[in-house]
Structure formats: C-alpha cells, structure tokens
UniProtKB/Swiss-Prot annotation:
Its cofactor is heme. The gene is CYP11B1. Expressed in the zona fasciculata/reticularis of the adrenal cortex. Changing residue 196 to A: In AH4; decreases steroid 11-beta-hydroxylase activity. Changing residue 143 to W: In AH4; non-classic; highly decreases steroid 11-beta-hydroxylase activity. It comes from Homo sapiens. It is an enzyme of class 1 (oxidoreductase). This is Cytochrome P450 11B1, mitochondrial.
Length: 503
C-alpha cells in the first residue's frame, strides 16, 4: 500500500520541474573527470526483499513507471535498483542509449521472459529472436531482417495491411452512418484489437481471419481468446521464479500452457497450409512474410514457426494501445486532429494508387505516432546486459551488469522535450536533422531493435490515415488517463470515443 500511496502523490505533482530537468539533462557536462566506481552510484532506497515480496503478493508492479520516474527526480539520471537477488542500473538520457549501442557486441544480450521460455522448453519448441541470445539469435536475426524489417519487405507487405485498414475504416463508417445522428459512441478497443490481429495475420500468413467487417470463424475466435489468456497469465507469472510459482500458481501455469498450445497449433496449421501451396506451385506474386521465409529455406520450418509466433504475440497489444492513445489525444486536441486530416486528404489519391507512399507522404501523422510513443511508451524500458565495461554518467559499469533505459522518464524530461505534458507532433518535425538520434527509441536500438517495428508502424499509420479521412473523433474526457505497468505500459481504463461522419 505504501508503494501505491507514493505513486498517487507522484501523479498529483507536476512532471520534472524545468530547473531539475535541466540538471538531469546537463549533469554529464559537469561531472568530475575521474570516473567514479560502481559502488559510488546512488542506490534506490528500500529493502530489496520486501519490495519483491510486495510485487509477488500483488501479482504485478502497476506503478513501476511512476516510482522510477520519482527516483530519477530524487537521485539524478542514473541509479542502482535492487530487486530480490537481482540488481540493475537505471538510466534515462539519450546519451546513455548511444553509449550502450556503441559497446554492443555481435550478440547483444537481454533478459528472457521466463513464462514464455518455460513453455517452449517443456513442449520442445524452438525460441525465436525475442527470446534468444548468442550466436543462434544472430543466425536467425540476419535471415529474418530482409523479409520483415527491410525497406523492401515493407514495400511488399504494406498493401496487405492497407487493405485491412480500409476495411476497418469502411466498417466503422458504415456503423456511424446507420445511426440517425450520424455519430457513434463506443468502446473502440475490441475493434482495434481485432484489426491488429487481422492485419498482422494477413501480412505474416497471407490469410484473413474475418475479424474486420465479417463474421469470424470459430478457429479465429479460439485463437483470439488464446492470445488474451496468454497475455493475462504472462503478467501473473513473470514476477515470480517458476520454482516457486509452480506451487503457488499451478492453475495459472496450466492456463498459460494451454493458451500457447492453441497459438502454436494455429501457427502450425497456417504454415502447413502455406507449405502445401508452395509444394504445388511457386506463387507468381508476393503472398506473405512466412511464404517468403519458406521459399528462401534459410531457416528451418520450426524456426520460422517460432519467430512467426513471437511476431504474432508481439504485434497485438504493442500496436493496440498506441492506436488507442493516439485517437484519445486527437479527440482532446481537435486542432492537431484537423491538421492530420488535411494531410491525409491531400495525400489520399496518391496513397490510394500506391499504398507504399503512406510512409513518405504523411510526415505529420508519423510525427503524431512518435509523440504518442513519447508520452505512452508501450515497452516501459529497454535493456542490455553490458558485454564490456563502460562509463555511464561518469560511473564505471562492469561487464555483465543489467542496464535499463526507462523510456517513460526519457520522454517526459523537459530538458529534452519542452512542455513534455503537451501533445505536440510538430516538435518531431522541428528537430529533424538535428542529430537527436536517440530521442525516439520505443522500438529499441541497434541490432536488437524490435523485429516487427515496421509492421507495427504500418498498421498504426494506415488505420489512422483511413479513419481520419472520413471520421471526426471526439471525447468528453479531458483528464489524463492513468497508465499502469502490466508487462507493457497500458491504460488502466479507456474512455468512450465518439466517431462523427465528416461531410
């Protein structure tokens, strides 16, 4: 309860004062020349074991972002944080992200997600690049990048995402026009959840699920339910060692394994179907990411399945919540919304003919997505296990130390972003070409950046483009939405939005 009370106080006060933020943003320029030892680094106060016990008891750490943000205000831009038997270094400045990338090895190392790894080990499944480390990670990653992350790959799968985004927009517009008032107020979260799964599934496997504007099959609904159960059980299990949780939470482990069984079975069916089609005849045109990976034959079918399952799981909530928060911010910032609408309408004909042009002809909309991820980073932190000794904020960091970059605090630092509480996409266009390469890193950095980032960006960009062309988004809620950490940073609740047809 003490942790929650402290977090509520933190919510009530303004974000970093300008004076304190300037100190955080410029401290590196005033540090003494002699590098300080690791032991001299400020340490977050509190008993490491009591803190861990409270997390276990509450099955989560909802206010982690607020407590870490408060600690940066109190201790400065770097501190040590001990939790149970583990320790880490927390940082929040772009310069430290750059230094971490500079010392990346050929195999940048990060911590694994134990519930996901435990399932794969128990069932004998391979791990994908999200869970792998070492040479096997690099082998997989180098063969996945050309078909998933490269500009050429984006050009090929983007029209498929565009088709789903158009269907979503048309279905929503139809519902709005069916209302005599020409408007519709609803909880849009389930619809956007369906959209992201539909778009990802089409790009990955070349198959529609019928979740957007159609009647989904029972198999699609089972797959959808399995994803929901998997995410919920992940949060319940991720903070406790399996050696303990297997006795305290056997029912949750059972649900977690059964959900993954359903997800992998679905992936098996999709891949087998593609494999049979390829054996019959080679397609004359692009059909899906997985089909290209199978044709290339540089990865085994099991490795392709493992990575496609990670892409499927990783492309849902991480896309849904930025879309929801962007719609919310546009609803309470109508001037920004109108500027984006004008941009989309001006580019509509060009994008309709060549959907790939959405990546170049919607700069303000792309900036709006950056602004959303600055304020509401889905991944709360980035992490690296230091592969060699380095110096951060004039402190020696030994090799093997876990370092976490907290994006919530980075994005709300007034020394980096004037008036950080303000939703202002234009700020990203104003700083283009200014050398601020590490101000926007919600998808990670270097070789370990998110493999599915281009797919996620395309899904968000195209949905907003098509919706804003036809519909005005409104809300009665002007207050900030409380965010909670639950494996990802997500809204604790989401207000109803009103969509109104535009003449």
């Amino acid at each position: 309860m003490a942790l929650r009370a402290k977090a509520e106080v933190c919510m009530a006060v303004p974000w970093l004062s300008l004076q304190r933020a300037q100190a955080l943003g410029t401290r590196a320029a005033r540090v003494p020349r002699t590098v300080l030892p690791f032991e001299a680094m400020p340490r977050r106060p509190g008993n490491r074991w009591l803190r861990l016990l409270q997390i276990w008891r509450e099955q989560g750490y909802e206010d982690l972002h607020l407590e870490v943000h408060q600690t940066f205000q109190e201790l400065g831009p770097i501190f040590r944080y001990d939790l149970g038997g583990a320790g880490m270094v927390c940082v929040m400045l772009p310069e430290d992200v750059e230094k971490l990338q500079q010392v990346d090895s050929l195999h940048p190392h990060r911590m694994s997600l134990e519930p996901w790894v435990a399932y794969r080990q128990h069932r004998g499944h391979k791990c994908g690049v999200f869970l792998l480390n070492g040479p096997e990670w690099r082998f997989n990653r180098l063969r996945l990048n050309p078909e998933v992350l490269s500009p050429n790959a984006v050009q090929r799968f983007l029209p498929m995402v565009d088709a789903v985004a158009r269907d979503f927009s048309q279905a929503l517009k139809k519902k709005v026009l069916q209302n005599a008032r020409g408007s519709l107020t609803l909880d849009v979260q389930p619809s956007i959840f369906h959209y992201t799964i539909e778009a990802s599934n089409l790009a990955l496997f070349g198959e529609r699920l019928g979740l957007v504007g159609h009647s989904p099959s029972s198999a699609s609904l089972n797959f959808l339910h399995a994803l929901e159960v998997m995410f919920k059980s992940t949060v319940q299990l991720m903070f406790m060692p399996r050696s303990l949780s297997r006795w305290t939470s056997p029912k949750v482990w059972k649900e977690h394994f059964e959900a993954w069984d359903c997800i992998f079975q679905y992936g098996d069916n999709c891949i087998q179907k593609i494999y049979q089609e390829l054996a019959f005849s080679r397609p004359q045109q692009y059909t899906s990411i997985v089909a290209e990976l199978l044709l290339n034959a540089e990865l085994s079918p099991d490795a392709i399945k493992a990575n496609s399952m990670e892409l499927t799981a990783g492309s849902v909530d991480t896309t849904v919540f930025p879309l929801l928060m962007t719609l919310f911010e546009l609803a309470r910032n109508p001037n920004v919304q109108q500027a984006l609408r004008q941009e989309s309408l001006a580019a509509a004909a060009s994008i309709s003919e060549h959907p790939q042009k959405a990546t170049t002809e919607l700069p303000l909309l792309r900036a709006a997505l950056k602004e959303t991820l600055r304020l509401y980073p889905v991944g709360l932190f980035l992490e690296r296990v230091a592969s060699s000794d380095l110096v951060l904020q004039n402190y020696h960091i030994p090799a093997g130390t876990l370092v976490r970059v907290f994006l919530y605090s980075l994005g709300r630092n007034p020394a980096l972003f004037p008036r950080p509480e303000r939703y202002n996409p234009q700020r990203w266009l104003d700083i283009r070409g200014s050398g601020r390469n590490f101000y926007h890193v919600p998808f990670g950095f270097g070789m370990r950046q998110c493999l599915g980032r281009r797919l996620a960006e395309a899904e968000m960009l195209l949905l907003l483009h098509h919706v804003l062309k036809h519909l005005q988004v409104e809300t009665l809620t002007q207050e900030d939405i409380k965010m909670v950490y639950s494996f990802i940073l997500r809204p604790s609740m989401f207000p109803l939005l009103t969509f109104r047809a535009i003449n």
